[in-house]
């Protein structure tokens, strides 16, 4: 009846005007009484030509991104193929992005095409799609033994060191602005910039230490600090943005500091607790629900639990990055050992592949941004920021290293301190955070974005590119070791990751073997002893002999199937078979 009335209202009969006017008026009143007021649509629906244009634009954006990734993969392959190990992949990919940006600019200048929208980097895409796999993989591939044994030192570098660097850079920018040396920024904006620019890129850092063959504990200190540093930097930046959104005009500096500290502690520990809890729940679920005979379901459950803490944390105003980092560490330490061998390998390789694609995409678009980003370049601001970034890194590394040496058996030498300071490269996270800042006016936002791009490119291209000369300059070993190091140095992350499967992730210990190997050891202390005695047995499944037999059969079947396919391939030959064997 309501639909009929609406039809009468929309299409009045023009032949019987008098009757229909009365009927129309009555029906309009009735319609208004019966039909509810329509609410706003949940999502804006675009139809017709506008929807078609948006679909075409999205398709071109996807095509352009995939094309950039494909070219970058070929570039990385050429680096590995021709053994250009002295050149970090991030440097090569950023350089390629700059070259592609220049070509696109020439094409646009000649009016042959317009790819402005496709080459622009969207910060929301970075934080929702690209950053979570990078952070989760870094936590998942962590060597937990050394990490938990050095958790105190790692936390000191990651939390206090990053905070020191943020305060040095932010405070320096604020006071230089007040002295009219550079453009003025208020205190919260200065601290936000200092926080985002304090995030270091761990890839080149770890390549340096692997090349120097340093102590694995020291390697873990730097790697753990680099991983936690990203999450801490993001939380500090969110803290500064939260203070910006509040009215802080009537609040003293001490009260502002206390509010910032309270916000940071809630974000840090709340997000870490949420990620840890999610990881422990995933371990219990996959311990008591045996999905090992259906690897596709098992792998699907792992992917769900991997992204789950990020969405939940962001939904309740916590840090999704911090949550997904701790979830990755916990899932790797407990959940991973409840998986079948096939899913263990599949999970490692999938995470590495996705993280590589995400990192490559960000570095490529970083190079493209030189020509696509609306810049506001101020030479004095850029120079002072570079000086403050280097000084803030020094104030972070040297005092904390000397402090740690009082409590450590493995001392951090001055040579190592210098290399740690030199290897504080900035990468994808500062760039994306700078685009995500909500600063007014627009000129201030462009100034921060341009300065961040310059600092990132300066550290990646200049510091990253001079990594190999520095290693050779500071290599003071004997001649044989010096010659060996020249051959062994390899800054290709992809080649190293592709050549190995983490052995600690493929543990096949029965209940008796686990007890003999871990629980009866007398040298375990603190959290390591607690974990081996109570936590690990509670959250992980101890394998029976039948489980081990089934896992080995599964792996053998898959290996034989793959080998048969290789032998039957069109390019198979006896020489190839001998090489495989």
UniProtKB/Swiss-Prot annotation:
Cellular component annotations (GO), alphabetically ordered: acrosomal vesicle; apical plasma membrane; Golgi membrane; multivesicular body membrane; trans-Golgi network membrane
Compartment(s) of residence: Golgi apparatus membrane; Golgi apparatus, trans-Golgi network membrane; Endosome, Multivesicular body membrane; Apical cell membrane
One protein family per Pfam: Na_H_Exchanger
Principal subcellular localisation of the protein: Golgi
Tissue: Ubiquitous. Strongly expressed in skeletal muscle and kidney. Detected throughout the entire gastrointestinal tract, with high expression detected in stomach, duodenum and ascending colon.
PTM annotation (Phosphothreonine): residues: 510
Topology of this chain in the membrane: Multi-pass membrane protein
Keywords from the named record: Antiport, Cell membrane, Cytoplasmic vesicle, Differentiation, Endosome, Golgi apparatus, Ion transport, Membrane, Phosphoprotein, Sodium, Sodium transport, Spermatogenesis, Transmembrane, Transmembrane helix, Transport
Family stated for the protein in its record: Belongs to the monovalent cation:proton antiporter 1 (CPA1) transporter (TC 2.A.36) family.
NCBIfam families reported for this sequence: b_cpa1
Protein name (record): Sodium/hydrogen exchanger 8
């Amino acid at each position: 009846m309501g639909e009929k009335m609406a039809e009468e209202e929309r299409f009045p009969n023009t032949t019987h005007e008098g009757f229909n006017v009365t009927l129309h008026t009555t029906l309009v009143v009735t319609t208004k009484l019966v039909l509810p007021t329509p609410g706003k649509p949940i999502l804006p629906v675009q139809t017709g030509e506008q929807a078609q244009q948006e679909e075409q634009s999205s398709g071109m954006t996807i095509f352009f991104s995939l094309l950039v990734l494909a070219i970058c993969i070929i570039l990385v392959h050429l680096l590995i193929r021709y053994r250009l190990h002295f050149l970090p992949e991030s440097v090569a990919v950023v350089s390629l992005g700059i070259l592609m940006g220049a070509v696109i600019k020439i094409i646009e200048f000649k009016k042959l095409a317009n790819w402005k929208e496709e080459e622009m980097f969207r910060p929301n895409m970075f934080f929702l799609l690209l950053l979570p796999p990078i952070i989760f993989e870094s936590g998942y591939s962590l060597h937990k033994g050394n990490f938990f044994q050095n958790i105190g030192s790692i936390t000191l570098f990651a939390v206090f060191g990053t905070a020191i660097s943020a305060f040095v850079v932010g405070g320096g920018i604020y006071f230089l602005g007040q002295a009219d040396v550079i453009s003025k920024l208020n205190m919260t904006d200065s601290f936000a910039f200092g926080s985002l620019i304090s995030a270091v890129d761990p890839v080149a850092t770890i390549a340096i230490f692997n090349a120097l063959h340093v102590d694995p504990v020291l390697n873990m200190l730097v790697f753990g600090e680099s991983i936690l540093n990203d999450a801490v930097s993001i939380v500090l930046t969110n803290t500064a943005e939260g203070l910006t959104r509040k009215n802080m005009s009537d609040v003293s500096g001490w009260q502002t500091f206390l509010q910032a500290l309270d916000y940071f502690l809630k974000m840090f520990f709340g997000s870490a607790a949420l990620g840890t809890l999610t990881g422990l729940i995933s371990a219990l679920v996959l311990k008591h629900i045996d999905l090992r005979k259906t690897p596709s379901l098992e792998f699907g459950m792992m992917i769900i639990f991997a992204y789950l803490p990020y969405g939940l944390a962001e939904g309740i105003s916590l840090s999704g990055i911090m949550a997904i980092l701790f979830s990755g560490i916990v899932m790797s330490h407990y959940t991973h050992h409840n998986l079948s061998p096939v899913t263990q390998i599949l999970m490692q390789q999938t995470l590495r592949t996705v993280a590589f694609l995400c990192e490559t995409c960000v570095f490529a678009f970083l190079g493209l941004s030189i020509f696509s980003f609306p810049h506001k370049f101020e030479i004095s601001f850029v120079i002072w920021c570079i000086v403050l970034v280097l000084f803030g890194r020094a104030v972070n590394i040297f005092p904390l290293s000397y402090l740690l040496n009082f409590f450590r058996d493995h001392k951090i030498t001055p040579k190592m301190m210098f290399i740690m300071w030199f290897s504080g490269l900035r990468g994808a996270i500062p760039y994306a955070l700078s685009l995500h800042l909500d600063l007014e006016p627009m000129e201030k936002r462009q100034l921060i974005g341009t300065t961040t791009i310059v600092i990132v490119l300066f550290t990646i291209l200049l510091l990253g590119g001079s990594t190999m000369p520095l290693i050779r300059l500071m290599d003071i070993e004997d001649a044989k070791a010096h010659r060996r190091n020249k051959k062994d140095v390899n800054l290709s992350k992809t080649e190293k990751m592709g050549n190995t499967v983490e052995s600690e992730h493929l543990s096949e210990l029965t209940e008796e073997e686990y007890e003999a190997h871990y629980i009866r050891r007398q040298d375990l202390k603190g959290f390591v002893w607690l974990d081996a005695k109570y936590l690990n047995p509670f959250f992980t499944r101890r394998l029976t002999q039948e489980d081990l037999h089934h896992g080995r059969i599964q792996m053998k079947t898959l290996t034989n199937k793959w080998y048969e396919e290789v032998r039957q391939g069109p390019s198979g030959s006896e020489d190839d078979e001998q090489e495989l064997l």
